[in-house]
């Protein structure tokens, strides 16, 4: 397997665009207004990335993002393979989707986000959702932990086939005029979440 390594001077770039047919793609310590990444077959690994907007398309292979901060708009499309987000912050609006594969979202913040999975579990660990966010799963469980002020966050959960438990409640938290709203919809699968008050 051949490897191509590109080293860029430390700078804030207007645009970084990479396209890959076959092979793994690793991107580290990049700061750009616009980031566009496309890969057909291979794993993608992003670490310490900041930008205004980010578009990632991965057809076959795993996708891992760590310490990625996007200020305005995020679009992540993962076709076949697992998706892992760790210590990430997505402000503005974000659309994150997988077709076949599990999602693992850890210690990350989302604003105005839509997170969708066709086939595969969605695992959350200490994630925070601001404004109006939606999690959808066709076949797979939604499980884990949230950082949420339940006095200012409305959590609306529903599954067609499966059970629901949010802090032991079957209906989540219905808060009138809530600052933040998280809607969870599952066709076939369980919803099991716990909440913890975020630290100031």
Please provide the spans of the model-predicted regions.
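Secondary-structure transition/turn motif
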Residues: 1-2, 198
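Extracellular beta-sheet/turn segments enriched in Thr/Pro/Gly and aliphatic residues
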Residues: 3-5, 17, 157, 183
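Short, surface-exposed interaction patches in beta-rich subdomains
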Residues: 54, 63-200
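N-terminal segments that cap or nucleate solenoid repeat domains
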Residues: 8-11, 21-25, 184
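Right-handed parallel beta-helix
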Residues: 15-71, 75-77
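Extracellular beta-strand-rich solenoid/capping regions of secreted or surface-exposed proteins
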Residues: 2-10, 29
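Extended, structured, electrostatic nucleic-acid-contact surfaces
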Residues: 8, 13-14, 92, 130
